[in-house]
Design a protein with these regions (language model features):
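Hydrophobic transmembrane alpha-helices that form the core helical bundles
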Residues: 55-67, 71-141, 146-149, 174, ...
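Hydrophobic alpha-helical transmembrane segments in multi-pass membrane proteins
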Residues: 54, 103-107, 166-174, 244-256, ...
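Membrane-interface helix termini and inter-helical loops of multi-pass transporters
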Residues: 33, 114-126, 183-196, 268-270
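Membrane-interface loop-to-helix entry segments
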Residues: 114, 132-186, 218, 240-249
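Membrane-interface "cap" regions at the ends of multi-pass membrane proteins
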Residues: 1-44, 48, 54-62, 70
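Juxtamembrane helix-boundary/capping and inter-helix hinge elements in multi-pass membrane proteins
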Residues: 38-41, 68-73, 81-87, 228-236, ...
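TM-loop-TM module centered on a large, flexible mid-protein loop between adjacent transmembrane helices
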Residues: 76-80, 84, 116, 120-121, ...
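Hydrophobic, membrane-embedded alpha-helices of multi-pass small-molecule transporters
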Residues: 12-29, 49, 137-140, 177-180, ...
Length: 293
């Protein structure tokens, strides 16, 4: 587990690892879920969550990664070094089991996104029989499994691409919400940045929705096995965690403000979570069509 990595495999930069971690931790759906549950009050919730949980959590992961910079097993290696091999085994096993549903739904999510890109609706998966759909999802899963087995160079390229794309798309949405009234005839909502608008009510219902934000910012330790692929792990791994943390904080807060421009903060639509993306895509598409016309 703790075998030194040869110099030829130390090809990751801290920026690339930060983008890879960002793509595994963050998604725009987290902003949508936060706004759907709390409206603009999610801004304060994000700040609370980042202050008491996410920032300390990422700093601890960065410290562990720099301390055990020669390990190749990530969390399992850390537990093995500080406790026992048996506990490390159980940690690795439970980590894999809890990620099985997450990994299994990823290929199907790609097909849903492809359907929106081609047909501008979510009908692609409904056009297929369950057997065909699951067969395609399985082929996609094995393809990316094969691609990942090619080594760190392949992961570096696809991880950096995924992270960069998420960052760019998040900021494009924020810019679109701000620029929509100026480039089209689309109207956006206005709101006051005061305590009444931003401060949530700290009751039981609020605490239950706060749990959604906790799960939204977990998983920065997933890329810890690649810490020894950095040229200077003790310095660069914490730097990559700080880089990722800043990007998450900025996109979460600015993205929530942008949602408030497109959806009335005083009358947040009460629709199921799986329909929020439909609302978001339809509204964005209408703005873009007005621009093209």
């Amino acid at each position: 587990m703790n075998q030194p990595t040869s110099s030829k495999n130390k090809i990751l930069t801290w920026q690339a690892l930060g983008l890879m971690t960002f793509s595994s931790v963050w998604g725009f759906g987290n902003i949508v879920n936060g706004y759907a549950n709390q409206g603009l009050k999610a801004v304060v919730s994000w700040i609370i969550m980042f202050t008491i949980y996410f920032i300390p959590y990422t700093l601890m992961v960065g410290e562990m990664g720099s301390t055990f910079k020669d390990s190749q097993g990530g969390v399992s290696s850390w537990i093995r070094s500080t406790s026992s091999a048996k506990l490390a085994y159980f940690a690795g096993w439970t980590y894999w089991i809890c990620h099985m549903p997450y990994l299994a739904q990823k290929p199907q999510s790609m097909l849903v996104a492809l359907g929106w890109a081609i047909f501008r609706n979510g009908s692609l998966t409904k056009m297929m029989s369950p057997l065909v759909l699951q067969s395609i999802a399985l082929i996609l899963f094995f393809f990316f499994l094969w691609y990942a087995s090619r080594g760190i160079r392949s992961l570096k390229h696809i991880g950096a691409l995924a992270g960069s794309t998420k960052v760019i798309m998040s900021f494009l949405y924020i810019l679109l919400a701000l620029a929509a009234p100026y480039i089209t005839e689309a109207k956006t909502f206005t709101y006051r940045l005061d305590m009444e608008t931003l401060m949530p009510t700290f009751d039981f219902d609020y605490m239950t929705t706060l749990a959604i934000l906790v799960f939204a910012v977990g998983g920065c330790e997933r890329l810890s096995p690649y810490v020894n692929n950095l040229k200077d792990p003790s310095r660069e791994y914490p730097r990559s965690m700080i880089f990722m943390t800043i990007m998450v904080c900025v996109t979460a807060i600015l993205g929530t403000f942008a949602m408030g421009l497109m959806f009335d903060p005083q009358n947040v639509p009460k629709v199921p979570h799986d329909e929020w993306f439909l609302l978001l895509l339809c509204k964005t598409w209408r703005i873009l069509r007005r621009r093209s016309n």
